[in-house]
């Protein structure tokens, strides 16, 4: 998003929209050059849908969602359900609960009133719609959202070449159950 940040600042744009290769995820840049993750996007959309009476129930997020997002929803009286990482889990939880908004910090956002999978362009349009509705810039729409410090760390594995499964357990299960 660094190039987008620079472009937003250079052109004094209101918003920068960064899509991934297939367009199902997005990250935003506000007018101050700050990067907004999927958690920020979920917060903006939840506040917008709630204010317009279109939020059905609560919001589904993955286990990777920042605890600050969950607490912000609780303060607003919006239920928050955590599910395993992956848009298939988000969609399954939306279908099970009847809710209509879910997503991940990666920018995979599902608003099931519009689509059943992540669509960065539709999500970006909804964000612009929210900015217009509130007549506020992105930075203002997320000012009350306080994230807890977190860091994703990849841990080294000394035995990278060895399989990370137990072959003897697999053999036992295969012998115990046919097919």
Ranges and model annotations:
Residues 21, 32-33, 41, 64, ...:
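Short, ordered loop/turn segments at secondary-structure junctions
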Residues 1-29:
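N-terminal small/polar loop signature for handling phosphorylated ligands or for N-terminal nucleophile
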Residues 40-55:
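Structural motif
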Residues 19-21, 35-40, 115-118:
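Short glycine/threonine-rich catalytic loop with a Thr-x-Gly-x-Asp
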Residues 15, 51, 55-179:
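Phosphate-binding and adjacent anionic-ligand microenvironments
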Residues 24-43, 69-70:
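Short Gly/Thr/Asp-enriched flexible loops that form oxyanion-binding sites at enzyme active sites
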């Amino acid at each position: 998003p660094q190039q987008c940040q620079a472009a937003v600042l250079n052109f004094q744009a209101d918003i920068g929209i960064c899509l991934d290769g297939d367009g199902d995820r997005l990250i935003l840049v506000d007018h101050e050059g700050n990067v907004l993750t999927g958690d920020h996007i979920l917060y903006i959309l939840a506040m917008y849908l709630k204010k317009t009476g279109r939020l059905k129930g609560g919001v589904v997020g993955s286990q990777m969602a920042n605890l600050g997002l969950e607490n912000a929803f609780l303060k607003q009286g919006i239920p928050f359900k955590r599910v395993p990482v992956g848009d298939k889990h988000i969609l399954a939880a939306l279908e099970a609960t009847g809710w209509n908004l879910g997503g991940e910090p990666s920018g995979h956002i599902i608003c099931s009133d519009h689509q059943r999978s992540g669509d960065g362009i539709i999500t970006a349009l909804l964000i612009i719609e929210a900015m217009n509705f509130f007549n506020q810039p992105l930075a203002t729409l997320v000012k009350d959202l306080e994230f807890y410090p977190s860091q994703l760390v990849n841990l080294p594995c000394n035995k990278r070449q060895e399989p990370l499964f137990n072959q003897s357990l697999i053999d036992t299960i295969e012998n115990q159950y046919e097919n």
